[in-house]
């Protein structure tokens, strides 16, 4: 009972954070810049094709957050948000060090590790996974999925950048500044 309450609190907190960040990136709500601003941000990070990575990141946060909140297909939701945090830490925050006040990876690490813990433990008794009898999906599926996500990111990011540099494909043209 206590474990299920703890998992529910973690799911709701972390899931809502990702859901709202994804909504900022997808829809430009809650002070976000929408897909155009997110695309420009990805371009500035050197992630190409930037529009593709903007969509992947925004959907990863939004859909992953929603799945975690609902406790529905929780290992998949946890994989989505963990993947986003891996990229955020590697491309944005790692060079700035650990501390969040200097733009470091501290906050993203907490969110990412919490998502990993949820992926390993499952959503708990108060979840759609439990109601549907899908709780057994959890740990093994998540670990295998995490390895696959890490390998895909390690291959896809450099490959996308190489293709963009050598073909001109993926050089996004922004019609609106990031602040729109």
Outline where the language-model segments fall:
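Hydrophobic, membrane-inserted alpha-helices
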Residues: 59-68, 92-93
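Short hydrophobic alpha-helical membrane-embedded segments
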Residues: 52-60
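Transmembrane alpha-helical segments of multipass membrane enzymes and assembly factors
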Residues: 68-74
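Extended, low-polarity transmembrane helix blocks
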Residues: 1-30, 51, 74-180
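Membrane-interface interhelical connector segments
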Residues: 28-53
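Hydrophobic alpha-helical segments within and immediately flanking transmembrane helices
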Residues: 41, 64, 83-87
């Amino acid at each position: 009972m206590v474990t299920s309450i703890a998992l529910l609190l973690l799911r709701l907190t972390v899931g809502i954070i990702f859901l709202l960040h994804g909504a900022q990136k997808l829809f430009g709500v809650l002070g976000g810049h929408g897909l155009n601003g997110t695309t420009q941000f990805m371009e500035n990070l050197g992630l190409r094709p930037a529009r593709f990575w903007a969509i992947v990141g925004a959907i990863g946060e939004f859909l992953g957050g929603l799945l975690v909140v609902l406790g529905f297909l929780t290992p998949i939701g946890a994989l989505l948000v963990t993947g986003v945090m891996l990229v955020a830490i590697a491309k944005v925050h790692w060079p700035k060090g650990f501390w969040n006040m200097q733009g470091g990876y501290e906050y993203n690490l907490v969110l990412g590790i919490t998502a990993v813990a949820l992926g390993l433990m499952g959503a708990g008794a108060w979840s759609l996974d439990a109601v549907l009898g899908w709780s057994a999906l959890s740990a093994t599926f998540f670990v295998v999925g995490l390895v696959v996500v890490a390998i895909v990111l390690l291959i896809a990011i450099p490959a996308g950048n190489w293709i963009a540099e050598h073909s001109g494909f993926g050089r996004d043209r922004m019609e609106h500044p990031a602040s729109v």
